[in-house]
């Protein structure tokens, strides 16, 4: 069972992420926006990508490594997931996750932060996160999950003058 087995119907995305995870670590973008409607598996994609990034075999093996198994099980010490059942993600939760993001990874090459439903942040909360996304620590990768590129969080993340679809294409081409 590969780290990618839970991703159904997204073979092109899986192939791109495999290539990125196994490529030059210096060329990996440190902030990602993973979009898809509720139930589409965007959180599964984020976890699989995190598992591949933290795994010595980069997620290319037929069986997940111990590190990949830990990421997929939610027990890896260098991968933190912020998920909420509340209506909004609070500013204190984001401040705590920023503090975590600044710590050096303990066992793996990256400190990976996954934020599910990033569109649940209010504008002031998004502004707190913005600096970290724009200038992440050299050892941190942010995986942000949202139901669409045009969610209310994106205008704060994208640079002025660049459409959401163009920014996503630009990110994928790197």
Question: Model features per residue range: what roles?
Answer:
Residues 1-124:
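Clamp-loader machinery-focused feature within the broader ASCE/P-loop NTPase space
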Residues 102-103, 127-144:
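Conserved catalytic/switch belt of AAA+ P-loop NTPases
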Residues 116-117, 144-149, 167:
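A short beta-strand-to-loop transition that corresponds to the Sensor-1 phosphate-sensing loop
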Residues 13, 85, 148, 164-166:
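Short, solvent-exposed coil/turn elements at secondary-structure transition points
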Residues 152-174:
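Conserved AAA+ ATPase core "coupling" helix
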Residues 51, 130-132, 158-161:
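Glycine-rich, phosphate-binding/catalytic loops in enzymes
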Residues 28-29, 75-78, 108-110, 136-140, ...:
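Short glycine-/polar-rich loops that comprise or flank the Walker A/P-loop
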Residues 40, 150-151:
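Short alpha-helical
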